[in-house]
Amino acid sequence: MNFILFLLILILNSSSIISAGLQVKGNKLYDGNGNELIFRGINIAHAWFADRTKFSLNEINSLGANSARIVLATGHKWTKTSYSDLEKIISWCENDGLICVLEVHDFTGSDDPNDIISLAVNYWSEMKNLLNEHQNYVIVNIANEWLGSWNKGSLWGDTYSSAIKALRAIGLKNAIMVDASGWGQETGPIIENAHRVLESDPDKNVIFSYHVYAVLGKDDNSLISGFDGLKKTGVCWIVGEFGWFHSGANVAYKTLMNYCQNNGIGWIAWSWSGNGGDDACLDLTSSSTFSGKDLSDWGKYVFFGEGGIEKTSKKAYGGSGGNDNYGYCEGCEITATGDDGSKWGYENGKSCRIDINKCNGSGTDIAPNGFPYCSSCDVTVTGEDGIRWGWENNKSCVINESKC
């Protein structure tokens, strides 16, 4: 009898290895196994580049991201993301071990409560069964940057409280995310009303989100003040979007990443690729290729900089992320250099570490700093450290002083 009871307990436990769904407890988010989850993710513009979504998710996974925030559409402004499309997106995220934050972008900047309480809720209601099946990986970000106006804290709190009650009433079980007002950058309303919004959810499973650009992130003091204010409320919050430059001004992105690392706060950078006009500088990689092989300077910092994904990302449910996700390259071709001096290549569709010891002694003409030696002696620039550089085959190379 005792042996049978033991087997029954074992079966019950094994069937619930991943069962609780993503859950907020206090100011932290936990996966279904009870592991703390700190977002280190990337925004993916599915609504405008649907044919690139699967590839983009594979790329950010190969670079170590643990999450993706996906731009969807209800059909009110852009082509509707259908049930079958959403099913594919979720499966791609899960196959890559990425926590999937889903947001509808149609109501960005809108001040109309009906857009949230009716239109956004109706869209999520249509998708409810699919969303509930995947509550271990899916978070519902009700709407991107609803309420563009400032100083309307009561409207923000009332509207989101009503929307959350409506979503729970139709049976949605997923964790919910709510953006700040003022295009995601206003601090007062979210600080003053976050607890009221949280209390509207019978599950108390709400994550709050700042978006950081040239207002909230205009300087270190503004950013730290806004972050400290929300931190003091004790709610669970993340940075759902941020860039390095916006509206003609720099953003305190390095301070942001350091603050988040020091305080256990998650972030999701904007955005993988496809930005237009003045926002093209926010592309993390080439808009032509969408490839992790072609990271911009912004992309290199997000992945390899201080507090970046390479150093800090940990996958949910014990999956590999950050350094654990990489092996050494077979070859010695360098495509990026981390802030810590690490050299990186790109092979077989994913990033890999350059084995400097192997490459320096392999006869491949690799300089001690990990870059290849030039075949010629034509100098294009001299670094502050005295190293002379050339340019061959559309890449930087080191002048070989022993030959030149």
Regions found by a protein language model. Give the residues of each.
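Extracellular/cell-surface secretome signature
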Residues: 317-404
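Structural motif
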Residues: 37-39, 65-67, 97-99, 135-137, ...
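Cleavable N-terminal signal peptides of Sec/SRP-targeted secreted and luminal proteins
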Residues: 2-19
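Aromatic-lined substrate-binding rim segments of carbohydrate-active enzymes
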Residues: 52-109, 117-122, 161, 168-170, ...
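Redox-cofactor binding/interface segments in oxidoreductases and associated redox assembly factors
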Residues: 44, 70, 209
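N-terminal carbohydrate-binding accessory modules
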Residues: 15-67
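Extracellular glycoside hydrolase catalytic/binding regions
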Residues: 50, 119-139, 143-275, 279-307
